[in-house]
């Protein structure tokens, strides 16, 4: 009886030590992630598509009423892949807010994200590939190496590569 009690007591102490070590490690990770001077903390949100501002032109003239569709593919679950829509104003101007998600445990897992970004433009029954890009970071504004995301999309332009992205839009 006495050996069984001692064995349980030793087992309980081992479990407590392991639990304390795990709690300590998680606390250190959270504090490290929240510390200033780091680009992204453990609890920061994941930026799947940075804020976008742009203008749609046709032969250099602003296009009013063009529909823009912004898509992100970052998960095998289609319900987790967001889509946003907007329409250009009289000056051909459009904007999309950033698409962000909660980090959850993803910040603790060392991995290279693969995020497929797409912007399509629909105008007068024609669909144009405005922007295709493979984003490899959860940080904001990494699409254009830290610059704000500003585009000029010329509908008469043939889609082509510009840096790491493809489409009719040029970064300005």
Model-identified regions with their sequence ranges:
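N-terminal secretory signal peptides that target proteins for export/translocation
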Residues: 1-14
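Compositionally biased low-complexity segments at domain edges in trafficked proteins
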Residues: 148-172
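Bacterial N-terminal signal peptides
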Residues: 21-32
